[in-house]
């Protein structure tokens, strides 16, 4: 009998629950939506409570208490309905929020990251600036080369035009003159051109002589350096003996004096023959000249002033011929 009564009680209880659910399903749907929007913070608590109630093992005492509450007061049923409707509404709002968050995450994933984009754009812009700067430098170099070439071409053209203009001006200037004066003017121009050519040749010879002299000086400096090194080695050696100092200038003067004496003896009578000066032999200090000697013949004027007039004119004529040859042929006058 106890079992049958408990079965009937359970059936009646399940029927009541179904009725309550049907009634509350229509009325509480709108309330649950508004209530879930206002109070979304209590969702986790009600959910945990409902889950804990469902998971707890049901006993006879728990069933009796529940029956007593439902039969004694209808407030519990209304509270139950409200809590269920709230949990449903909250579940819907949670689903909506979750779907929104998922869609946001999908959008954020689908969108390219701004940092990576900015880095790639910075790299590409850096590469572009590098390539642009290189192109600018290349263009500048090409422009400079073109300008230099144009300047050189302009200078060559100017020189060519100047030469042409000079020849044209000469011809135009000589046209109005008589033939004799034209010949004189042309001869004068030829002489000027020859003089310019002679000056150019002389300058070339001077440059060559200077180059030779520099080479000789370099060679002499090398010889002097070797001699200096040997002298230093001799001084540093143990067999070195200190001697009195003699300057090289005095030795050079003595050599020059001996050369002058040798020239004087050769110009004198042929019977007198002087020995050639030897640089290796030591020169006596008595032979070194200490004063300047002048070759004075007690003459008040130069001997050319005492030449006859015909001889002087002849010499002057020869001098003019030599100068003319120098201007025409470019050969230097002796």
UniProtKB/Swiss-Prot annotation:
Recorded coiled-coil stretches: 180-225
How this protein is processed and modified after translation, per its record?
Phosphorylated.
Which residues fall in a compositionally biased region of kind Basic residues?
A: 14-24, 35-50, 78-118
- Which InterPro entries does this UniProt record tie to the protein? SRRP53 (IPR034604)
The residues the entry assigns to the signal sequence are: none
Region (Disordered) residue ranges read 1-179, 201-220, 259-284
Q: Which residues cross the membrane?
A: none
Q: Which GO terms describe its biological process?
A: alternative mRNA splicing, via spliceosome; mRNA splicing, via spliceosome; nucleocytoplasmic transport
The protein's predominant localisation is nucleus
- Which subcellular locations apply to this protein? Nucleus; Nucleus speckle; Cytoplasm
Compositionally biased residues, Basic and acidic residues = 1-13, 51-62, 132-166, 201-218
Describe, as the record does, how this protein assembles with itself and its partners: Interacts (via Arg/Ser-rich domain) with LUC7L3, RBM39 and RSF1.
Which named protein is this?
Answer: Serine/Arginine-related protein 53
Q: Which organism is it from?
A: Bos taurus (Bovine)
């Amino acid at each position: 009998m106890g079992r049958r009564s408990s079965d009937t009680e359970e059936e009646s209880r399940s029927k009541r629950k179904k009725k309550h659910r049907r009634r509350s399903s229509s009325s509480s749907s709108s309330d649950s939506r508004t209530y879930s929007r206002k109070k979304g913070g209590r969702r986790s608590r009600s959910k945990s409570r409902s889950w804990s109630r469902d998971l707890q093992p049901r006993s006879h005492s728990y069933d009796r208490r529940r029956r007593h509450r439902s039969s004694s007061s209808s407030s519990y049923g209304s509270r139950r309905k409200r809590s269920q409707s709230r949990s449903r509404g909250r579940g819907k709002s949670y689903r909506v929020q979750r779907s929104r968050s998922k869609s946001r995450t999908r959008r954020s994933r689908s969108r390219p990251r701004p940092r990576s984009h900015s880095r790639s754009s910075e790299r590409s812009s850096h590469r572009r600036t590098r390539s642009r700067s290189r192109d600018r430098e290349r263009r500048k170099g090409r422009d400079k080369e073109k300008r230099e070439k144009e300047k050189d071409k302009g200078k060559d053209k100017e020189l060519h035009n100047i030469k042409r203009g000079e020849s044209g001006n000469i011809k135009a200037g000589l046209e109005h003159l008589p033939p004799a004066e034209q010949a004189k003017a042309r001869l004068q121009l030829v002489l000027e051109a020859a003089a310019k050519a002679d000056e150019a040749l002389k300058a070339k010879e001077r440059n060559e002589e200077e180059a030779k002299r520099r080479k000789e000086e370099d060679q002499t400096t090398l010889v002097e350096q070797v001699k200096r090194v040997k002298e230093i080695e001799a001084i540093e050696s143990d067999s070195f003996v200190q001697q009195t100092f003699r300057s090289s200038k005095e030795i050079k003067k003595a050599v020059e004096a001996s050369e002058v004496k040798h020239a004087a003896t050769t110009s004198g009578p042929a019977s007198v023959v002087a020995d050639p000066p030897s640089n290796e032999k030591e020169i006596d200090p008595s032979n070194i000249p200490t004063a300047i000697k002048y070759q004075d013949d007690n003459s008040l004027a130069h001997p050319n002033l005492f030449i006859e007039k015909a001889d002087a004119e002849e010499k002057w004529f020869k001098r003019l011929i030599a100068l003319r040859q120098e201007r025409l042929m470019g050969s230097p006058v002796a």
